[in-house]
Regions:
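Left-handed beta-helix
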Residues: 1-92
Length: 92
């Protein structure tokens, strides 16, 4: 974790770089989470890059995906939002 990172109630795999806030989430190997990001109630799979100032809540981010900076991806209660290479779909 870098200075300013805040991780609560989460599992973080080896090789990750965390610069933002992570809460109630699972982060797989070699994920990069940019500055001022907020990750809540989500699963971030292997080799994911999340740009600065991004919010991800109630989502699963597919392996080797890149999430652009300054974006928001928020799933609705009772749904899981899956993010795959800039396409989004909903699964109950």
């Amino acid at each position: 974790y870098n200075i300013g990172a805040n991780v609560r109630n989460s599992l973080i795999a080896s090789g990750c770089i965390i610069n933002g806030d992570v809460e109630n989430s699972i982060i797989f190997k070699k994920a990069y989470i940019g500055n001022n990001c907020v990750i809540k109630n989500s699963i971030i799979l292997n080799d994911v890059y999340i740009g600065d100032n991004t919010v991800i809540e109630n989502c699963i981010v597919e392996s080797r995906d890149t999430i652009r900076a300054n974006t928001k991806h928020i799933g609705e209660p009772g749904e899981i939002k899956i993010i795959i290479e800039k396409n989004e779909r909903y699964v109950l």
